[in-house]
Amino acid sequence: MGIKRGQWMPIALFLGWAAGAAHAAPGPDDEDAARATRWRDLQHAIFGDRRIQDGAGWIEIDAPVRALDAALVPVNLRLKGDKPVKGIYLVIDDNPGPLAGHFIFGPQGDPHSLKLRVRVNAYTYIHAVAETSDNQLYSAARFVKAAGGCSAPVGADEQQAMQDIGHIKVRLAQPFVAGKPMQAQMMIRHPNFNGMQMDQVTRLYTPPMFIRTIDVSFNGTQVLHLDSDISLSSDPVISFGFIPPQKGQLKVLVRDTKDATFGQSFDVPAPAG
């Protein structure tokens, strides 16, 4: 199941109302109940009536309990075992746009390790929901203490934040062994303005302009596709695995909400052995 472009805003608007109701509840017990209700609302908004099974022990979410920078919170997702996974949903429950990203893995992709940086607006649970090839859903959660990341300024001013927009780098882990997953780190220069940041010079809110999709392929075969939203950090850094059977080219294509596209190809060496 994928989230179409037009579906993201209704989810955010609906859940923005739900968030207000949740934060109105006083006391720790009521707060826990409100968080549980919030997650149930999110499940229904994103997945409808589909059943989500407990993925604890299979899905691991590594994130700081208390983040040093709420605008750059590192999240490391790891999948154990051999369940065939075709997609991962990353949900930041109390963000204005809770569905931070939907990763879809292609034939050359390896879903077992995924790292990225996100914005966190308030103390929240982060949920990772894995979808297997037989359309089963499994989830795990991690509570993160951070606040203000969605409205944190991007650089000293808008002009600085826009410098070198669209520049892409990829670092490949060595050595490369045939038939084994290869780790790649993808760095994209993009401010990811979400409409909540204030320009520190003009004191006006910067209009939204953020990455909507990222496509990665190897020799023309899909590695992964990402549908993103306002919770992805500025200048995203995403690490992922892929399985190249031979030397070739890794291609990255990025599209933002202004329909600007940025692309670049990178050589992958022949495997050792």
Predicted regions and their residues:
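Beta-strand signatures of extracellular beta-sandwich domains
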Residues: 87-91, 213-217, 253
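Extracellular Ig-like/FN3 beta-sandwich strand-entry sites
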Residues: 121-125, 181, 245-249
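N-terminal edge beta-strand
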Residues: 43-70, 160-178
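N-terminal export leaders
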Residues: 1-10, 14
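Aromatic sugar-binding surface patches on proteins
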Residues: 107-115, 230-239
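Short edge beta-strand/loop segments characteristic of extracellular beta-sandwich folds
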Residues: 62, 74-80, 183-191, 199-202
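Short acidic/polar inter-strand loop motif in beta-rich domains
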Residues: 133-139, 256-264
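Low-complexity, Pro/Ser/Thr- and charge-rich linker/hinge segments at domain boundaries
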Residues: 29-31, 147-169, 271-273
